[in-house]
Amino acid sequence: MHKPSAAARTRPSFVRSLSAPLAAISLAALAACAIPTHPDSSAPPSDPFNPAAIQLIDDTSWQLASWRNADGTQRELPPQDQGANGQPAVPTLTLSTADGVRRAAGFSGCNRFGGTYAVKNGLLSFGPLAGTRMACPNSAGGKLEAPYLDALAHVTKAGLQMQAPQQLYLVTQDGATLTFSRRDTP
């Protein structure tokens, strides 16, 4: 009968002894992917439009919190509970690098959308965004969808507030400011 070598007999215990440290290192690496928060919550907020801040946008998820038009008026957003199929009608935006490509996805008030995004020289920009084709012409979310997707296509300035509550600011070509609140789940 063939008897396993000493190295073969010790390999499983060696592998088992590495399992816990490897798991701890993996968890630490995942935690490092989160947007850093400012260590001093009493410090004045930093400039969210600092070009370095937007570089931290990858692998985050956001929900539209407010929309201020260029003239200072607020665009009305749908209530949280008015979406189709129990889905909130308030638009969302998720920015992911899970497959090695910067991908944007979200909910635009009526339909889901997806496409690519880029971060260059402190500017966040979106490639063509494709969406599903549900019809929601009379819903609050449906009325917001076309302007929302148009705003994403015309971002001229982006800012990221890292101090709680974390917020993403997108300023459009026509001067509107969309403010997003951080979502814990994508």
Question: Which residues does each predicted region cover?
Answer:
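Bacterial N-terminal signal peptides
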Residues: 19-31
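Lipid interaction determinants
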Residues: 2-11, 16-19, 33-186
